[in-house]
A protein has these predicted regions:
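Crotonase-fold acyl-CoA enzyme core
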Residues: 1-102, 137
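Hydrophobic alpha-helical segments typical of transmembrane helices
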Residues: 41-44, 53, 106, 127-130, ...
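Proteins with a high burden of low-complexity, intrinsically disordered sequence enriched in S/T/G/P/A and R
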Residues: 2, 30, 129-131, 177-178
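C-terminal long alpha-helix characteristic of the crotonase
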Residues: 19-24, 66, 75-126, 132-138, ...
Length: 178
């Protein structure tokens, strides 16, 4: 909402979903100031919009409007200013109330980690193991039953206690707890 230039542009990059208002502007102006991108922008930005587009925005320091940001894929949704919080709540409700929290957490780790692999082989191996363990979970049973009964699912598994033992990133999720 408003100008996101420099660190304002980079700090939103790690977000899974980015919502902008029609008055938003984005600028990666670091080279114009004699410095380089920060906030891991050199890692996130090319993953989000591609290397050539990331280079163009960083080389030029051009400030773009919200329409161009949406077109580039820098933001996922474009709304009017008075609809920003409504859209955020709508999406959070959609993601948090209709999907298994454990499956969402696992999917996030899998996509961020496995998309960096050189080939799909490791993704296939990990997915094959995890579909079996998650397929036997209470959440999977609830997901199927809610579909068959045409009702909303009520997932009971918790990230803190129900991540499968064979989930490769299990220890890194709970590292901060120790």
């Amino acid at each position: 909402n408003g100008a996101a230039v420099g660190v304002g542009a980079t700090m939103q990059l790690p977000a899974d979903i980015r919502i902008a208002t029609s008055n938003s502007r984005y600028g990666f102006v670091f080279a114009k100031r004699g410095i380089v991108p920060d906030g891991c922008a050199s890692w996130f930005l090319p993953k989000i919009i591609g290397i050539p587009r990331a280079l163009e925005l960083c080389y030029s320091g051009r400030v773009i409007n919200s329409d161009e940001a949406l077109k580039l894929g820098l933001v996922d949704y474009l709304v009017e200013e008075d609809q920003l919080l409504d859209k955020a709540f709508e999406l959070s409700d959609l993601y948090l109330n209709s999907s298994s929290p454990v499956s969402v957490a696992m999917t996030r780790h899998m996509i961020w980690s496995l998309s960096a692999e050189d080939s799909p082989e490791n993704a296939h191996i990990i997915e094959s193991k995890l579909i079996n363990s998650r397929g036997a979970s209470e959440d999977a049973k609830e997901g199927v039953m809610s579909f068959l009964e045409k009702r909303d699912a009520k997932f009971s598994n918790k990230i803190s206690s129900d991540l499968p033992d064979d989930f490769p990133w299990r220890k890194s999720i709970f590292k901060a707890d120790k």
